[in-house]
Amino acid sequence: MGMSLSHLLIVLLIIFVLFGAGKLPQVMSDLAKGLKAFKDGMKDDGSDNDKNK
């Protein structure tokens, strides 16, 4: 039950309306930085457990 193309377009349209064209690049940049930090945190968390065993 994944998202179809029409659902994705509706979600993108809602995001565009909420944030506007000027702020959208900044929002996407912040989201990408947050995801990268989360992934790095998950990698660091797994390596700490191996060192302590």
Swiss-Prot record:
GO terms for molecular function: protein transmembrane transporter activity. It holds the Pfam family TatA_B_E. Signal peptide: none annotated. Its main location: membrane. One of its GO terms (biological process) is protein transport by the Tat complex. It is a single-pass membrane protein. It comes from the Bacteria. Keywords: Cell inner membrane, Cell membrane, Membrane, Protein transport, Translocation, Transmembrane, Transmembrane helix, Transport. InterPro entries: TatA/B/E, TatA/E. One of its GO terms (cellular component) is TAT protein transport complex. The chain crosses the membrane at residues 1-21. It is found in: Cell inner membrane. Belongs to the TatA/E family. The Tat system comprises two distinct complexes: a TatABC complex, containing multiple copies of TatA, TatB and TatC subunits, and a separate TatA complex, containing only TatA subunits. Substrates initially bind to the TatABC complex, which probably triggers association of the separate TatA complex to form the active translocon. PANTHER family: SEC-INDEPENDENT PROTEIN TRANSLOCASE PROTEIN TATA. Part of the twin-arginine translocation (Tat) system that transports large folded proteins containing a characteristic twin-arginine motif in their signal peptide across membranes. TatA could form the protein-conducting channel of the Tat system. This is Sec-independent protein translocase protein TatA. The lineage of its organism: Bacteria, Pseudomonadati, Pseudomonadota, Alphaproteobacteria, Rickettsiales.
